[in-house]
Every structure is written in C-alpha cells, then in structure tokens.
UniProtKB/Swiss-Prot annotation:
This is Phospho-N-acetylmuramoyl-pentapeptide-transferase. It is an enzyme of class 2 (transferase). It is found in: Cell membrane. Pfam families: Glycos_transf_4 (PF00953). The keyword Cell wall biogenesis/degradation applies. GO terms for biological process: cell division; cell wall organization; peptidoglycan biosynthetic process; regulation of cell shape. Belongs to the glycosyltransferase 4 family. MraY subfamily. The chain crosses the membrane at residues 1-21, 46-66, 73-93, 113-133, 139-159, 174-194, 207-227, 233-253, 282-302. One of its GO terms (cellular component) is plasma membrane. Its EC number is 2.7.8.13. It comes from Deinococcus deserti (strain DSM 17065 / CIP 109153 / LMG 22923 / VCD115). InterPro entries: Glycosyl_transferase_4, PNAcMuramoyl-5peptid_Trfase, PNAcMuramoyl-5peptid_Trfase_CS. Keywords: Cell cycle, Cell division, Cell membrane, Cell shape, Cell wall biogenesis/degradation, Magnesium, Membrane, Metal-binding, Peptidoglycan synthesis, Transferase, Transmembrane, Transmembrane helix.
C-alpha cells in the first residue's frame, strides 16, 4: 500500500499543478529575499493539499479494514488533517489575495496560533493516556496535557518554518520519520506520499508545499514521537526545524529590542543563501545534518530498555 500511496500522491500532485496553472494559483516571492528566488514567482503553491489528500484516501480504507493500526493512528491522522485545515486556510488566503490583488493576505499569528493550540489541546487530552510515558512524571496529568499541546504546536510551526527551499522540508520530514516507520502506519504513509510530492518539488520545483502540507507534517511528527517513542527525541531528529524556528524567534527579538538583525534573513536557510550558498547546497547539507541527528535517535531508541 505504500507504493499505492506514493503513486497516488504523484498523480494528484501532477493534477494539482495542471489545475493551479490553469487558474493562476501562484506563489508570490519576497523581493527582499534571495534574488535567485525571483524566477519562482508564480510557481503553483499549496501542493500539500494533494499529498495530504492522498494520505487520507489510503489511510481510511486501511483503518476501516483493520490494517492501519488502532486508535493512536486514527488520532495522529485526524490531528494531521485538522492542522492541515488551519494551514490550508492560510494557503487559500494567500492565493486569493494574489489573484485579486487585494484582501486579507494570510492568517495573522494571533489568529493562527489559537486555532493550532485548540487542535493541539484536543490531541493532547486524547493522547496523554495513550502516550508511551508521561513527559515529566512528577508534574502530573494536567501539566502533561499542556506540555503535549505545546510540543504539538511547536512542531507544527517548526516544520512550517523549514519550508522555503526546493525539496528541503520534504526530505527533512522523510528522514525524521524513518525511525518510526515500523511502528506508525501514518508515518509510513506520510513518507510514501512525500516521495510522490518530491518528484515535482525537487529543484527546480514545479510546485511548492504550502502551509497545509507543512502543518500536517509537523502534526504527524509530533504525534508519532509522543505516542510511540520519546517526545524528547523529536527535537534531536528535527534539529533543522528547531534551528529554523529559533532563528526566527532570535531575529524578531533582536530587531525589536536592539533594532538589529542577527541573520541576513530568517528562517536560517535563507541566511545561508544570502551568504552565498547555492540553494541545492543548503538543502542537501540540511538533509545530511538531519540524517546524522536521526541516526543518533535511532541508536537511542535501540538502546532503550
């Protein structure tokens, strides 16, 4: 079924690209970013819609027939879809704003964060009894729910900030999820559909992922590590998303308090681009870093009693 998922994703993403071009759904590009990105203006965006749909179309028949795990897998899948909807609203606003030349450009952080946190709280409430262990045993179940929710929101935003270069987030996500393939069918399905997506997202990308895809990825990664492994291993495997979101936070705090920027541009992948690294070098080097970190996680999982 993983091959079916990959092929279905490949087909739906290709269909999405053709439909997007016919309707003029394109990605606006920041003029203050790397000049090499200007050629990407108008590239179809929100391609995550296609691979998330492919994942759902394969998962639910498998689940209903008893071949996709139990309630933990259903919880991860539903959370990924809910987070994907939040990101999808953002994608839709961006596309509509570009096509009309006016209107609301995107969800503001103060609008997006409460929606993310609401989804995360529902997940945390249901996941806490199913998790492999309490995050901090001495704090009790209520704080465990709060911490799980914060991890979920942090993961969604960290993976979202990792997007922006051709193939970067898809490759990073596949590597991060590798240790959990045998444990979590949803993680395995996500890896499969991302392979289908990367066929078109590899440099030079014919489609961008958008927020729906990145939100779903962050939700699956957090859900799988919380329910099957050790949540504290997630920031090790996902070191690139962690650094990406930290670079944004540091940049904002520095500019607001000191009036100075630490990085040429944030998230940090764009800093390296503006420092002279070719886009493909940044992507592959970030994959390598993720692979080394995930190998350490794999070893730590194997060493657990």
């Amino acid at each position: 079924m993983l091959m079916v998922a990959a092929l279905l994703s490949w087909f739906l993403v290709g269909l999405f690209i053709r439909a997007s071009k016919a309707r003029g759904w394109g990605q606006p590009v920041r003029k203050d970013g790397p000049q090499t990105h200007l050629v990407k203006e108008g590239t179809p965006t929100a391609g995550g819609v296609a691979f998330v749909l492919a994942m759902a179309l394969v998962f639910f028949p498998l689940y209903l027939s008893g071949h996709a795990g139990g309630e933990r897998e259903l919880l991860i899948m539903l959370t990924a879809l809910a987070m994907g909807v939040v990101g999808g609203v953002d994608d839709w606003l961006k596309i509509q704003s570009r096509m009309r030349g006016h209107g609301k450009k995107e969800l503001l952080a103060r609008e997006k964060f409460p929606l993310q946190f609401l989804v995360a709280l529902v997940f945390a409430w249901l996941a806490a009894p199913l998790a492999s262990h309490e995050l901090v045993p001495s704090l009790g179940p209520v704080m465990d729910v709060v911490l799980i929710a914060l991890v979920m929101v942090g993961s969604v935003n960290a993976f979202n900030f990792t997007d922006g270069l051709d193939g970067l987030l898809g490759g990073v996500a596949i590597i991060v999820l590798l240790p959990l393939l045998a444990l979590s069918p949803v993680s395995a399905l996500l890896v499969a559909v991302l392979l289908g997506f990367l066929w078109f997202n590899a440099h030079p990308a014919r489609v961008f992922m958008g927020d729906m895809g990145s939100h779903a990825i962050g939700a699956v990664a957090a859900g799988a590590y919380i329910l099957y492994a050790d949540v504290w291993l997630l920031p090790i495997a996902a070191i690139i998303p962690v650094v990406a979101v930290l670079s944004v936070m540091i940049q904002v705090i520095s500019f607001k308090t000191r009036g100075k920027r630490i990085f040429r541009m944030s998230p940090i992948q764009h800093h390296f681009e503006l420092s002279g690294w070719p886009e493909t070098h940044v992507t592959i080097r970030f994959w390598v870093i993720t692979a080394v970190a995930t190998a350490a996680v794999w070893w730590l999982l194997g060493a657990r009693p």
